[in-house]
Regions:
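N-terminal nucleotide/polyanion-binding subdomain common to many enzyme families
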Residues: 2-104
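Short glycine-rich anion-binding loops that position phosphate/pyrophosphate groups of nucleotides
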Residues: 55-59, 181-186, 207
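A transmembrane-helix-recognition feature enriched in membrane-embedded lipid enzymes
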Residues: 84-89, 217-260
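Short gly/pro/ser/thr-enriched loop/turn and capping motifs at secondary-structure boundaries
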Residues: 85-87, 185, 207-212
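Conserved beta-alpha
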Residues: 86-168, 172
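Short Gly/Thr/Asp-enriched flexible loops that form oxyanion-binding sites at enzyme active sites
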Residues: 134, 187-196
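Short, flexible loop segments at boundaries between secondary-structure elements
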Residues: 151-157, 199-235
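Proline-aspartate-enriched helix->loop->beta-strand connector
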Residues: 169-178, 182-183
Length: 260
């Protein structure tokens, strides 16, 4: 269902965001403290807009698919979830650019949610994962307001179902709408619903699974050494080997060697 809202104009000036272009994707050359400060200042204006959480895989996909690249560049910003992206950015002179992951952003926002009064809607994943996620939120983030959760069917939605979801999220009065459909599906979904969903949409991929305890995150030393991809590869070798081998090679050739 392609109803991208061409008329949508961001209420926040994009020139406020330092940007490094890597393989055609405009990546925010930022870090977590900057992003949290930005979020707190502009959360009301960000309603209806979306943010991509970008890594090497999504950047290579964007390089090969102009329509997906337009989606990555069509939101308020694309943050550098992948360590290699921030490394390339720093080499290109963006000294403040640091790896800023989706799961970490979600956690940082949850930490300040009770005092800020933020309401959260979680869209994606399975009902079982959403139940576990709810347990984690209740236990680890007391006072956090969950406005709603919904696990959509895997098949394409009808116009009526889609409209019902838009209405359901609107009625929830959520400030944040966290999307856990995985790339590239979640980014395309956010772009199609830009200006239709009330709340700030953030595509956080596996963050629901991390918080629910389905997938363990890499130890901190591996995260800091940009080796989280290797840890994920050891967890799911069949699913991830081809993807990592192909995209990492393509990224190194284009972004690192050719300077794209």
């Amino acid at each position: 269902m392609n109803h991208m809202n061409k008329a949508f104009v961001s209420k926040v000036e994009k020139t406020l965001i330092p940007t490094c272009r890597i393989m055609g994707v405009n990546l925010a050359a930022i870090n977590m403290p900057w992003l949290i400060k930005f979020t707190k200042k502009y959360i009301k204006e960000l309603s209806g807009d979306y943010m991509c959480v970008s890594n090497v895989h999504t950047t290579v996909m964007s390089y090969e698919d102009a329509s997906y690249c337009a989606v990555q560049n069509g939101g308020i910003m694309a943050i550098p979830d992948g360590g290699p992206l921030s490394s390339v950015g720093r080499k290109r002179g963006f000294s403040e650019m640091e790896r800023t992951t989706g799961p970490d952003y979600l956690k940082e926002v949850l930490k300040i949610s009770a005092e800020e009064g933020y309401r959260h809607y979680f869209y994606g994943s399975t009902e079982e994962t959403l139940r576990k996620l709810q347990d984690t939120l209740t236990k680890d983030y007391p006072g956090v307001q969950v406005a709603g959760m919904y696990s959509p069917p895997f098949r394409p939605l009808s116009e009526e179902e889609d409209k019902a979801i838009i209405d359901m999220i609107k009625e929830s009065k959520a400030d944040f709408v966290w999307i856990g459909l995985g790339a590239p599906k979640q980014e395309r979904w956010m772009a199609e619903h830009q200006g239709e969903i009330e709340g700030f949409m953030v595509g956080v991929g596996a963050a629901f699974d991390y918080l629910a305890g389905n997938i363990e995150r890499a130890p901190m030393w591996m995260q800091k050494a940009n080796l989280e991809w290797l840890y994920r590869l050891m967890q799911e070798p069949k699913r991830l080997f081809k993807r990592y081998f192909y995209t990492n090679t393509k990224f190194i050739w284009n972004a690192v060697i050719r300077g794209k």
